Regions:
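An N-terminal boundary/leader segment
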Residues: 1-125, 361-363, 555-561
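Acidic-enriched catalytic cores of C-N bond-cleaving enzymes acting on peptides and small amides
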Residues: 2-59, 280, 287, 292-319, ...
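N-terminal, positively charged, Ser/Thr/Ala/Gly-biased leader segments
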Residues: 84, 101-163
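Acyltransferase
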Residues: 87-91, 121, 171-172, 346-372, ...
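Structural helix-boundary/capping segments
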Residues: 100, 176, 180, 230-336, ...
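Short, surface-exposed loop/helix-turn segments at secondary-structure junctions
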Residues: 383, 464-482, 501-516
Length: 561
């Protein structure tokens, strides 16, 4: 794959210069001012959100701060469609804020501010002269994970080698759908090499930092979106998820994220390596939204499915969105048992307990599910990782083919079950191994289907991960998200509370591979979160339950963690 005419470092540096040149000069802050914004006093990373870095920067006007902080995406659409706000001023506001996010957290890849603002002007003119909207997303700025192809822009997915290849001359299926719905695309966001680690770093764009605490990971693989949305540099972001890549950055960055059932949101036409994931048997990757409210997750899903996505991507099933209304029904919620091989860090365990208490006090029925080896998280993780071992090449092959070194989070990700702890003997031929593994996967699915059925569950309440955001390159194995990809169940993250070095000091480290260390001082103040899961193709029920749960825990004293 790699050419040898130009050193990869030179190519990467040249592209970073092009990226910087795409930002208006007046939006670039002097290095001394940037260092001042990063210096928040305690020596444990920069608390960019808590220290109000945006306000201190002076880059945005008061109106632009209101536009980017006060409104949901749904509210912005309402104001633009009534012409109370113009798409141009909304797009400029989010572009300026995204440019600051980039300077402080390295969350962006392809910068499309100029094109986005021009499209916003055209949409404003269309609405003014004809009175007609371009579509239900008319004028709304939307950010995209780098893997989504946008015509005329690179989709490197973090590989320098991809900069040597022709710039895409076509859009991914979802990009076409969003444009037809009237969206404004203004930036793409960072991810890791391989898109298979929980840290977002590569040799082109560097490492994305968490705006809550820059010494902690922003998560991965959609970490750029997580950081940008948390920084309020985007009203609505689009990521992808095959093992937790939407949900892990969401919980790390304190935002909402949703992984739909596969084949409901168009995924075709993305840039991918080493896994051509949308064509191989195994775990299906999915696209999904990331935002600062559940309302905006629902907005994305409703509008996407209303656009008849099966006409954009032949793999999408023809299932229109079902509107379940705004009711506050009482739920029956299964409380997932903690896998003893992967014990939760104290802040995660406390957030789950507080959420469960609030839900029970509000009259929801809780069913505490006992530990069962037929359906525990570790088994789901082992199934998932063995499927990945079949789907793609080993890391040595990846490094050789891309012609550049692996970043640390990828290099240290030696297969967590390489010692043979697989559900199926790894030395079988591939067809036999895949057949046997699918049998194990079916039994795992059956165990969970029976759990929902026998307990009459609406949803499951579970952790999103063993930990909160933790120091870079230490995340561990994402079994509490990967298991739901193995099952292809819709799942969403709700931010809830914060870690506390005073309340969360006790932890016994597990013996499981890649169990991350818990360091109370390092993660103090990091966002905590819970995960809600529904059965396959019950995406509408999952989001409805997320809305009910979110409202319940916000209205309770439990939020004061």
């Amino acid at each position: 794959m790699p050419a040898t005419t130009t050193n990869w470092k030179t190519i990467a540096a040249q592209h970073r210069e092009k990226q910087r040149d795409a930002v208006p000069a007046e939006w670039l802050l002097p290095e001394k001012q940037l260092q001042g914004l990063k210096n928040t006093g305690d020596g444990n990373g920069s608390k960019l959100i808590e220290s109000k870095a945006v306000q201190r920067s002076g880059l945005l006007t008061e109106k632009e701060i209101v536009i980017t902080e006060k409104y949901t995406a749904a509210e912005l659409l309402s104001k633009m469609h009534s012409q109370e706000l113009s798409s141009e001023e909304v797009t400029v506001a989010f572009s300026k804020r995204a440019s600051l996010a980039q300077q402080l957290t390295s969350c962006l890849t392809e910068i499309m501010f100029k094109e986005g603002i021009q499209r916003a002007k055209e949409l404003d003119e269309q609405l003014k002269t004809t009175g007609k909207l371009a579509g239900p997303l008319h004028g709304l700025p939307i950010s995209l994970k780098d893997s989504y192809r946008v015509k005329g822009h690179h989709a490197t997915v973090g590989y320098v080698e991809f900069l040597r290849q022709p710039i895409p001359d076509h859009n991914s299926a979802l990009v076409d759908l969003l444009l037809d719905a009237g969206a404004v695309l203004y930036c793409k966001t960072n991810l890791p090499q391989t898109m298979m680690t929980a840290d977002s770093e590569n040799n082109i764009f560097g490492r994305t930092l968490n705006p809550h605490n820059t010494s902690l990971t922003a998560g991965g693989s959609t970490g750029g979106e997580g950081a940008l949305v948390a920084f309020r540099g985007s009203p609505l972001g689009v990521g992808s998820d095959i093992a937790g890549s939407i949900r892990i950055p969401s919980l790390c960055c304190g935002i909402y994220g949703f992984k739909p059932t596969s084949e409901r949101v168009p995924f075709g036409g993305q840039s991918e390596y080493p896994f051509p994931k949308d064509h191989l048997p195994g775990i299906a990757p999915v696209g999904g939204p990331m935002a600062n409210s559940i309302e905006d997750l629902e907005l994305f899903m409703k509008i996407t499915l209303a656009q008849r996505p099966w006409n954009y991507d032949p793999t999408v099933v023809d299932i229109p969105w079902r509107d379940l209304g705004e009711g506050d029904a009482k739920l029956t919620i299964g409380i997932m048992a903690e896998d003893p091989e992967y014990p939760l860090h104290p802040p995660v365990r406390r957030a789950l307990a507080k959420a469960a208490s609030a839900l029970e006090n509000a009259g929801h029925k809780l069913v505490y599910l006992p530990q069962d080896p037929k359906r525990n998280a570790g088994l789901g993780g082992r199934i998932g990782f063995q499927l990945f071992s079949i789907m793609g090449p080993d890391l040595d092959t990846v490094s050789r083919e891309i012609g550049e070194p692996l970043v640390n989070s990828v290099a240290i990700a030696v297969h967590p079950f390489a010692n043979g702890n697989f559900p199926v003997p790894p030395d079988l031929d591939t067809p036999t191994k895949l057949s046997r593994l699918n049998e194990v996967r079916f039994e795992y699915l059956k165990a969970w289907q029976e759990t929902y059925r026998d307990n009459k569950l609406d949803v499951i309440l579970a952790p999103g991960a063993v930990t909160t955001a933790i120091p870079h390159d230490t995340y561990g194995v994402p079994i509490y998200t990967l298991m739901w990809n193995v099952l292809d169940f819709p799942a969403g993250i709700i931010p809830f509370g914060k870690s506390s070095k005073f309340e969360d000091s006790e932890h016994v480290k597990a013996k499981a591979p890649f169990d991350p260390d818990y360091i109370p001082e390092a993660t103090d103040g990091a966002p905590t979160a819970i995960q809600i899961i529904a059965p396959r193709y019950r995406d509408e029920e999952c989001l409805r339950a997320m809305r009910i749960v979110d409202k319940t825990i916000r209205n309770s004293r439990a939020e004061k963690l």
